[in-house]
């Protein structure tokens, strides 16, 4: 059993992660970042929960780029095949639940 205080985790570089758990082929990680990730498509489902900070989530629907601002407590669900990019607005901490080894 472990307890985590997400606001206290700081990485040494953008998208550093603290591994929290693995079950089946699913991983749960707490990420720290202050820079955008990259456009990508996961090979499975993804749950992206903002624990601290603010993140602009851009995603594509039928080739059109759309955007939504996620604040602390907000959750983004990407179904398999959803192309997206997370763009933090300053420092952010996010909990990501996804297929083990996913991009």
What is each model feature region?
Residues 24, 51-52, 71-72, 90:
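A cytosolic small-molecule/anion-sensing beta-strand core signal
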Residues 26-42:
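Conserved short histidine dyad/triad with adjacent acidic residue
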Residues 80-103:
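Ligand-binding loop in jelly-roll beta-barrel domains
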Residues 35, 44-62:
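Glycine- and acidic-residue-biased ligand/ion/polar-headgroup-sensing regions
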């Amino acid at each position: 059993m472990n307890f985590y205080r997400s606001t206290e985790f700081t990485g040494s570089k953008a998208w550093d992660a603290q591994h929290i758990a693995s079950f089946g082929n699913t991983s749960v990680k707490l990420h720290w970042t202050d820079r955008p990730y990259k456009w990508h498509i996961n090979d499975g489902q993804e749950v992206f929960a903002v624990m601290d900070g603010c993140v602009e989530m851009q995603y594509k629907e039928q080739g059109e780029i759309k955007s939504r601002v996620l604040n602390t407590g907000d959750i983004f669900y990407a179904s398999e095949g959803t192309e997206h990019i997370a763009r933090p607005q300053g420092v952010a901490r996010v909990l990501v639940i996804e297929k083990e080894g996913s991009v």
